[in-house]
Structures are given as C-alpha cells and as structure tokens.
Amino acid sequence: MSSISTGRTALRSARRVVVKIGTNALTNATGRFNRQHFDALGQDLLWAAQGRELVVVSSGAIALGVERLGLPSRPRDIPGKQACAAVGQSRLVQAYEEAFAAHGKAVAQVLLTHEDVQERRRYLNVKHTLERLLTAGVVPVINENDTVSVDELKFGDNDTLAGLVAGVVDADALVLLSDVEGLYTGDPRRDAGAELLATVMQVTPEVLALATGTSSGVGTGGMSTKVRAAARASDSGIHCVITSGAVPGRLRAVLEGADVGTHFEPTGSRRSARAAWIAHALRARGTLTVDAGAREAIVTGKRSLLPSGVRGVEGDFGRGDPVDLVDAEGAVFARGLAAYDANELRRIAGHRTADIEAVLGYRYLDEAVHRDDLAVL
C-alpha cells in the first residue's frame, strides 16, 4: 500500500475537488470509448462525491464522435473536429448521467469557451452558476465547447480549463487524470530509466522543460499543458496531482493522501476572486516593460504601476484590456488592466503623473495600471 507524505495530508481534508479526465483515460489503445474503464472511473468519482463537492472537467467528446460516426481516425481539420464534438458531447454526458443517477446524484452539463471567463461579467455568471450547482449537490460536468471554439481545439485546452475552473470555484484540490502516472525525468514511453517525480515544490523552467514533448495520439493535450495548469492552481494555493486514470482506485488514493502520481505543492496563498481572474482567466493583449524600481514597488510594496516606471509598450490594446508586465530581461512578473490604451501609454511612458495631462491633453487616472487591477504572478 502507498504511504502518506506530510505534504499530501491536506488532500485528505479537501472538501471541494476538481477532477479533469483526459481523452486517454476514457479510451482504449485504438481511441475507442472504453465502457469498462469508464465504469471503474465512475466508481472512483462516486466515492469522491461522498462528503465532498465535486466538479468534473471531461475530455472525450471528439473521440466519442469519431466512434459514433464510424470514422477511421480523428479528423485533423477544425470543422471535422467540431462535427465530431457535436455528435460526441451528448454521448459523453449521457455516460456520466447514467453513472451518477444510479446513486441518486444529478449532473449538469456546462460547456465553456475562454471568452466565458475573459469578460468579467460572464466570469462571475459562470462562478455563481457553478456555486449554486455545488450547493445543490449537483456534479457539474464541464467541457470545452469544441463545437464553436476554434483556437481551443489546437492544443490540450481542457487541462487549462480545469486549472481555470479550480480557481473559479476556489477548489481545495485539482486532480488531473491521464494515461501516464505523472511527471517523469524523461518520457517513460521512450526512456526506461525515466523516474517519476513524487513532489514538485515549484514549477520552474527546468520543470517545464521536463514536460515538453510528452503527449499521445488520441487527445490534444500533453504533459506540458498539465504542468502549466498545475502551476496556475499551485499559484492560487490549490493542491494539484497529476496521475493515471487508467489505474482503478487511483483518484481515491490521491484523496486519501497516498504517494501516487506527482503532487504539486501550493506555492501561493488564496487570491481574491478578482486577482485570480486577472492572473489566470485573462489573456494579455499587450506588454509593458517596467524598470527595476517599478517592479520592486509592485512585487514587494503592492503598489500601482505609474507611467514613470514604464520603459516600453508592445501590442495594440485599449483601456481596460489585460497586459503583461515584464522586467528588463523580458520575464513576466505580473498581469493587470491598462488604465490607458497602447498609444496613450507610449506617449506618457517615462513621464511623471503630473505631466499626463500636459502630454495627452487629459488625464483619466494617475496610474498606468492601478494596484487593484494588478496580480503578481
């Protein structure tokens, strides 16, 4: 039996859990839906739902659509993938309904695109809906809306989606189930000497390098997307474990604190809902290069970014759009909402606050990015 490490004991008391199930955890070697395997996963999920609030982020719609349409392989073109997703999504949700209904649990289908969390009002609508479902004892089954999302079909976005959802619902734990045991020092399919990393204290560039290039042929995600999702969760104070969904009882072992898979320790504290939205739900539309003094004031002093600290502006963005803040070396250290558009910031960059009106002829705010609209990464 697996032992229990000190760092994982918090998983035993996790009350709100997000579980992401990858395509490869639902299909066999030929890419077909594996009913026996799904039933075993269903038992794990039912156990997890007892005494906990459970959210399931599930891949598999495209693979099920391929099977239902009798296609020899997964389409490579976007319309083909979207058609398969449209056919397969109903079958996927039906499978979850049958698994949970036998034990009196209701499920709710929730289809999301990145745009649903990009805009603040829609983000809050998603959050409030999921909160209401969980309060009612319903298990939300969430999937990327592949039928209408073009960009999201290009890579393993359900890993990213699961990380975002974990932040939206303020989860205690995120479990990413795949067809591999966790993060290895090499690709275990090619390197017999690759060793499993039991614990990752912080996702560094070296850790991300280990994840690069590990993927499979049925789903769209690889280890890189999983590690990045784990990093987002960890940064928000959420425990994350990447492990195999192909092993019966593995989810239960994770939530009992056993040493299985790769555990990503939380590195940050719980963010406010607004800070979490800025940090993880938004996609930057531009970049502001800041000087060392401004970086120190933001990171250590929790201060706003003033125009005087801006050294460069890249991109074409409007007021209120998300922008990344980078240091002189180009490293992103914060994300925020711009108080001025790109052209305005180019004109006032390096100027004192008192000079803004003289340069522009008007002044909206004293800051380039207000501290209430900033999230340090």
From Swiss-Prot:
Chain sites annotated for binding ATP: 20, 178-179, 220-226
Record keywords, A-Z: Amino-acid biosynthesis, ATP-binding, Cytoplasm, Kinase, Nucleotide-binding, Proline biosynthesis, Transferase
Domain PUA intervals: 285-363
Catalytic activity: L-glutamate + ATP = L-glutamyl 5-phosphate + ADP
Top-rank taxon: Bacteria
GO cellular component: cytosol
HAMAP family linked to this entry: ProB
UniProt name for this protein: Glutamate 5-kinase
High-level lineage: Bacteria, Pseudomonadati, Myxococcota, Myxococcia, Myxococcales
Gene: proB
